[in-house]
Each structure stands twice: as structure tokens, then as C-alpha cells.
Amino acid sequence: MTIKVGINGMGRIGRMVIRAIIESKNKNIEIKHINNRSNSEASCTLIKYDSVHGKFDADLDFDKNHLIINKNKITFSQESEIKNINWKKFNVDYVFECTGKFNSKEKLLSHIKNGARKVIVSAPVSYTHLTLPTILLV
């Protein structure tokens, strides 16, 4: 079964998620959609050239609505609000929330309402009545 993922936010962590998935060469994980505030051209450049990790060894290209990584066309959008991202339309099951902006249950539920089955959050999440542990996956 292929795990179909989307990435919201392409800061340091979002870009590292992309690199990790591509470099793993795991055929069971497929990036279906990326949402980032900057355009696809700038996002492509940021993935390709990293000041810490160096040049990404992948074939990267873009058009207005896609990032193309190793000939795989990934849909791309520039939405500021989760409520405007239709994960179901992009066939996404799991969303990596990497903006750091949406860190409460109320805000994150928009991903689920828009079609994602699960959300993996890269920043601590605040709940009004619960303290949740932060889990580091290495």
C-alpha cells in the first residue's frame, strides 16, 4: 500500500521531509501535493540548494502549479489558510504540517476536514486542557 503524503510549509523542516522521502527511495511513500507561500520556482531552488546539507542530488524542475522531482509531477499551491487546501482532491492521506503556524487542535482539524486522514506536526501542539508529549523520530 502506497502512503500518499502532502506537505504544508517548506521551511527547513518541510524541505528536509521532502529530501528524506526522496532519498529513502521507498516506493511505498509518494508526495502528492506541496503547499507553500512562496512560488514553485523559489521552492524548487530552496530544495535544490541547502546551505547546511548542500546540493540535493535529484532532478528538480517546476512549472506554475507543480514541482517536478525525478520526473514525478507534484501538485503545488500557495494557500495561506488550511481551509483552502483540498487534500482529498490531491489524493493525500497524511499531511506533514511544517509551517509552525498551525499548532492547536482547532487549527489542525482543518486538515482532517479537508480530506487528510492523519496529520504529522513538526512543532509542539498546544491544547487548552492537555499536555501532550513531543515525540522525536530519528
Give residue spans per PLM region.
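Glycine-rich Rossmann-fold phosphate-binding loop(s) that bind the pyrophosphate
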Residues: 10
